[in-house]
Swiss-Prot record:
GTP binds at residues 221-226, 357-360, 399-401. Keywords: GTP-binding, Hydrolase, Nonsense-mediated mRNA decay, Nucleotide-binding, Protein biosynthesis. It comes from Mus musculus (Mouse). Residues 209-435 form the tr-type G domain. Residues 1-16, 103-116 have a biased composition (Gly residues). One of its GO terms (molecular function) is GTPase activity. Residues 218-225 are annotated as: G1. PROSITE patterns: G_TR_1 (PS00301), G_TR_2 (PS51722). It comes from the Eukaryota. This is Eukaryotic peptide chain release factor GTP-binding subunit ERF3A. It catalyses: GTP + H2O = GDP + phosphate + H(+).
Length: 636
């Protein structure tokens, strides 16, 4: 019998496979030790001794598996150099020397039990001389547990899945199909390369860096995901090998220039079409700050997703394509450049970096004239939206595909004298966030995972493990069981961080995006009716009382009706009209009463700007932006 296939069956199958292919080494040894009669037995005593043998076999197997079985183990890779090593669970109390089959089985046990083919085995081998058998088994099991708990485990398991599919097209035993040294070498490379991002995500004992959410916005195909992927590579969050793998896959699909964006577009559909749909998330670090990239979709069908991303952002990066024709398409009416910039301002983004991308394109060739032309067209519009060109906006040229001017000064644009993109981000002044303010965490998403887990950005206040909170507007009392900040477990968090919080006392079905986690003693306001100042951005016809639209406020999306128009506001002087208007039209500002279909959480803009500014959308267009002035109590 082939020992490698037998070992594979024993390591993976547990008790489900037949006697012919389940851990043959243990069965042989037990048979050798059993003093019972021949195969055909001798009446009652024969059956008794066979029962005893079966019992001993069962105990042996269950003891072995209960101690060492690891469902997350890496795929079995034979290691020819470790044949002499036998783990403690295969040595019986007083056992004769093992047969070659047993040694092969032992070799397999080492490979699968340790979770890695060579390095963990060698370390435990050194220590087996000093300690007892139990020490060895501890040494074997510990790396597995650590591996399971690291924050990088999603990426690791994904890498291994890839490896299994490549190495074992026709079942488990094909591990012998190529030289074991080669596969072992590959696995060792894997071990060395994966932990790199780990230290970047959670440096132990280091002072906590300020956390900043950056949303990449702009027209479809301006290069947002490519720049995001390039930043991930330049800051060491994606290794060269992974990037080369994306490049190979992109070439196979004739999408050669898209490979960088695949670091953020993880969904297969997004990769095939080259369009971001969801808001992609990724992390990178500079010397002073920890950044989360929110890569917003640029296509107009996905603007609601983009609003969700912008509502969590501290800083927006507007990506513009300098390529002839592309800039004009994105900026003219119908393009997303205008709408995205406006929505970012409405969502509360104070600082805007405008990256003029694709400067390496043959139609541009790092032309200063083209750069200035794009800048001249953008400034008046951004000023109109509400950004201050001197304080809030910073322009810079770059190439997402080559990485020019992202981390280091580029020789291609000697005319640009500012800092490159990543150093500029690192030197931004700190954001003022209220640690002492009331707890406000708007829910972005929720899912089940050993309880109910909610996702969101903590806007103000601080949360710690074991704290009692309230989920508004339903007034559900909940307890915080665990907190993950950017997938790293922590006991307490400050404002501005992206969190996953495990809650007790509420079911996942009882939560909707737009709900707010609050302090017991300081609940947020909730209701259906409020007065607001709104600016009509784009609407062909007039808007009268009774008009319906979709309200986007913080992470909440709800249907809303304008029930009454109270007065018009003069744009320049701010004076309010004495009479009630019968309608409003494009470019006018008015104060109106709005009523939502369901109860929502909101605050006045004056008290809490993040929960007091909103957008009205209709038929796929942004109709108006506004701010909440007054909450109107419900009539019973």
């Amino acid at each position: 019998m082939d020992p490698s296939s037998g070992g594979g069956g024993g390591g993976g199958g547990g008790g489900s496979s037949s006697s012919s292919d389940s851990a043959p080494d243990c069965w042989d040894q037990t048979d050798m030790e059993a003093p019972g009669p021949g195969p055909c037995g001798g009446g009652g005593s024969g059956s008794g001794s066979m029962a005893a043998v079966a019992e001993a076999q069962r105990e042996n197997l269950s003891a072995a598996f209960s101690r060492q079985l690891n469902v997350n183990a890496k795929p079995f890779v034979p290691n020819v150099h470790a044949a002499e090593f036998v783990p403690s669970f295969l040595r019986g109390p007083a056992q004769p020397p093992l047969s070659p089959a047993g040694a092969a089985g032992g070799d397999h046990g080492a490979g699968s039990g340790a979770g890695g083919p060579s390095e963990p085995v060698e370390s435990s081998q050194d220590q087996s001389c000093e300690g007892s058998n139990s020490t060895v088994s501890m040494e074997l099991s510990e790396p597995v547990v650590e591996n399971g708990e690291t924050e990088m485990s999603p990426e690791e398991s994904w890498e291994h899945k890839e490896e299994i599919s490549e190495a074992e097209p026709g079942g488990g035993s094909s591990g012998d199909g190529r030289p074991p040294e080669e596969s072992t070498q590959e696995m060792m490379e894997e071990e060395e390369e994966i932990p790199k991002p780990k230290s970047a995500v959670a440096p132990p004992g280091a002072p906590k860096k300020e956390h900043v959410n950056v949303v990449f916005i702009g027209h479809v195909d301006a290069g947002k995901s490519t720049i995001g992927g390039q930043i991930m590579y330049l800051t060491g969050m994606v290794d060269k090998r992974t990037l080369e793998k994306y490049e190979r896959e992109a070439k196979e699909k004739n999408r050669e220039t898209w490979y960088l964006s695949w670091a953020l577009d993880t969904n297969q559909e997004e990769r095939d079409k080259g369009k971001t749909v969801e808001v992609g998330r990724a992390y990178f670090e500079t010397e002073k700050k920890h950044f989360t990239i929110l890569d917003a979709p640029g296509h107009k069908s996905f603007v609601p997703n983009m609003i969700g991303g912008a509502s969590q952002a501290d800083l927006a990066v507007l990506v513009i394509s300098a390529r002839k024709g592309e800039f004009e398409t994105g900026f003219e009416k119908g393009g997303q450049t205008r709408e995205h910039a406006m929505l970012a301002k409405t969502a509360g983004v104070k600082h805007l970096i405008v990256l003029i991308n694709k400067m390496d394109d043959p139609t541009v060739n790092w032309s200063n004239e083209r750069y200035e032309e794009c800048k001249e067209k953008l400034v008046p519009f951004l000023k109109k939206v509400g950004f201050n060109p001197k304080k809030d906006i910073h322009f810079m040229p770059c190439s997402g595909l080559t990485g020019a001017n992202l981390k280091e000064q580029s020789d291609f644009c000697p005319w640009y004298i500012g800092l490159p993109f990543i150093p500029y981000l690192d030197n931004l002044p700190n954001f003022n966030r209220s640690v002492d303010g009331p707890i406000r965490l708007p829910i972005v998403d929720k899912y089940k995972d050993m309880g109910t887990v909610v996702l969101g950005k903590l806007e103000s206040g601080s949360i710690c493990k074991g704290q009692q909170l309230v989920m508004m507007p339903n007034k559900h009392n909940v307890e915080v069981l665990g907190i993950l900040s950017d997938d790293v477990e922590t006991d307490s968090v400050a404002p501005g961080e992206n969190l996953k919080i495990r809650l007790k006392g509420i079911e996942e079905e009882e939560i909707l995006p737009g709900f707010i986690l609050c302090d017991l003693n300081n609940l947020c306001h909730s209701g259906r009716t409020f007065d607001a100042q709104i600016v009509i951005i784009e609407h062909k016809s007039i808007i009268c009382p009774g008009y319906n639209a979709v309200l986007h406020i913080h992470t909440c999306i709800e249907e809303v009706e304008i029930t009454a128009l109270i007065c018009l506001v003069d744009k320049k002087s701010g004076e309010k009209s004495k009479t009630r208007p019968r309608f409003v039209k494009q470019d006018q500002v008015c104060i109106a009463r709005l009523r939502t279909a369901g109860t929502i959480c909101l605050e006045t803009f004056k008290d809490f700007p993040q929960m007091g500014r909103f957008t009205l959308r209709d038929e796929g267009k942004t109709i108006a932006i506004g701010k909440v002035l007054k909450l109107v109590p419900e009539k019973d």
